[in-house]
A protein has these predicted regions:
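Active-site/acyl-donor-binding loops of N-acyltransferases
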Residues: 2-21, 62-84, 215-276
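A conserved beta-strand-loop-helix scaffold within acyl/acetyltransferase catalytic domains
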Residues: 2-16, 53-56, 62-77, 81-83, ...
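N-terminal accessory interaction module
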Residues: 3-51
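Hydrophobic alpha-helix feature that most strongly marks membrane-spanning transmembrane helices
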Residues: 135, 169, 175, 203, ...
Length: 283
């Protein structure tokens, strides 16, 4: 059960409306297939929370509905090969990647030290090192979601991890699990003390290079969007996250409150953008 009925501004949750929801999370393979999922029985729950529902798919469910967010679920086509991926990047992106790699190498004795962890034994070594980096990240401070503290959630047969070192100090990590035909972009972070060296970007490029030619067809950037995803992805599928509740006045009121709050936040953002634009034009 999950409770996504949260009044949020950015990553900060201001309040929540309690509802017990059955989460139905579509994999990238399922999203690309384009069909709506079969919804499980609710039992005592208040509704469903369906993530990565393809835009063209229609759920077989009645009741008040709220589209929490729309986005393109982006991915890298690993099966096409590294050369095709790099050719699809913009010239500016390729130049930026080279520049960041050179800068980090210069700070580390002339080389980039990325280590890959594939087996359970290797991932057992990866976990405490990655946790040390995760403890420094904003994801950990604000959300507590940087990387599982329990090693059992990381040391798995269907997972892979990478660490970027400066000297002998780990400064960035990436941990992925396998789902269907894709590697998932599950956990990533870097030590903010090294942010000027762009360790996350350098590590991401190294990890993708390692995955090309492997058994998986895609690297899945998961739900949501972001500049780095748009920059690196070679494909995507338009999706939405949807909440469907049982039919009653309380649930309709709850979703009405969510829509009203989201609309107010969006309007405030538009006003802020217009004021900033007016300020620049007035100089």
């Amino acid at each position: 059960m999950t409770n996504p009925l949260s009044l949020q501004v950015g990553a900060r949750t201001l309040a929540t409306i309690p509802r017990r929801l059955v989460r139905v999370a579509l994999s990238l393979d399922a999203a690309l297939a384009g069909a709506a999922p079969a919804l499980p029985a609710l039992g005592g729950a208040d509704g469903w929370y369906v993530t990565s529902l393809p835009e063209e798919a229609v759920l077989d469910a009645a009741g008040p509905t709220w589209v929490r967010q729309r986005y393109v679920r982006r991915f890298v086509d690993l099966a096409a090969g590294e050369a095709a991926w790099r050719a699809g990047l913009s010239a500016a992106t390729r130049a930026a990647m080279k520049r960041k790699a050179r800068k980090l190498a210069a700070a580390n004795g002339g080389h980039i030290d990325v280590r890959c962890y594939r087996t359970r034994a290797e991932l057992a070594l990866f976990h405490p090192l990655a946790r040390a980096v995760a403890a420094t990240t904003y994801q950990e401070r604000l959300l507590g979601t940087a990387l599982p503290a329990d090693a059992a959630g990381v040391v798995r047969d269907d997972a892979r991890g990478w660490l970027l070192f400066v000297g002998e100090r780990p400064v960035a990590y990436l941990w992925c699990s396998a789902q269907g035909t894709a590697w998932r972009y599950d956990h990533v972070g870097h030590d903010p003390a090294f942010a000027a060296l762009s360790p996350g970007a350098v590590l991401m490029e190294a990890a993708l290079r390692d995955l090309f030619g492997g058994p998986m067809a895609r690297f899945d950037f998961l739900e949501g969007d972001g500049q780095h995803k748009r920059t690196l992805a070679s494909g995507g599928v338009a999706c939405r996250d949807v909440v469907v509740l049982r039919e009653n006045w309380g649930n309709r009121a709850a979703l009405g409150a969510m829509r009203g709050f989201d609309g107010a936040v969006a309007a405030a953002k538009r006003v802020a953008v217009l004021r900033a634009l007016a300020g620049r034009l007035g100089r």
